[in-house]
Amino acid sequence: TGNDLGGSLRTPAAFNGVVGLRPSPGRVPRGTRLPSTDTLWVEGPMARNVDDLALMLDAGVGHQVDDPLSFDHSGPSFVKVLKQVETPKRVAFSPDLSVVSMEKEIAEVCRSAIRVFKDIGTEVTDEIPDFDGVLGAFQTLRAVLFAIMMEPILEQHRDMIAPEIVG
């Protein structure tokens, strides 16, 4: 397992041919090292494949008394649900979400992969939400979180910390 604030589980997984999942806040308890009100930073699994990831998620979910955002998992096992998944009727696709730049060749590989969805009868749309301002909002929220967590370090060594971290 690991944690994810802005892609720390998902990005390395994507680069290494494994699966990383950022669960909903509170799904996997975080312990006490983070402010109890923070919902940006979550714990989650990384695994070789989706089946293993579901198994890890089953093992990691649940309420933990020292994490007030955590909650009991009263639903069925993720492994069980995975075996009952139906073919999606509609999916949206965007190689870059209009947020990051992408090499043309990589975008083409991604576009060719969406044929799998079309071949199983899924409607594929390219509707992209308006993400204007999202990066700035994320960086502000991240700076506040880091300022809370690292107050003593910030007071003594602010000049040594990257500006995009401290805002």
Label the model's feature ranges.
Residues 18, 47-51, 104-107, 111, ...:
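Electropositive phosphate-/nucleotide-binding environments in soluble metabolic enzymes
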Residues 14-17, 138-143:
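Short low-complexity, flexible loop/linker segments enriched in glycine and/or proline
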Residues 80-94, 143-167:
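Short helix-loop capping/hinge segments that flank enzyme active sites or metal/cofactor-binding pockets
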Residues 1-64:
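Short glycine/serine-rich loop segments
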Residues 23-26, 33, 51, 55-66, ...:
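Generic secondary-structure signature for well-ordered alpha-helical cores
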Residues 40-42, 65-140:
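Gly/Ser-rich, acidic/histidine-flanked active-site/gating loops
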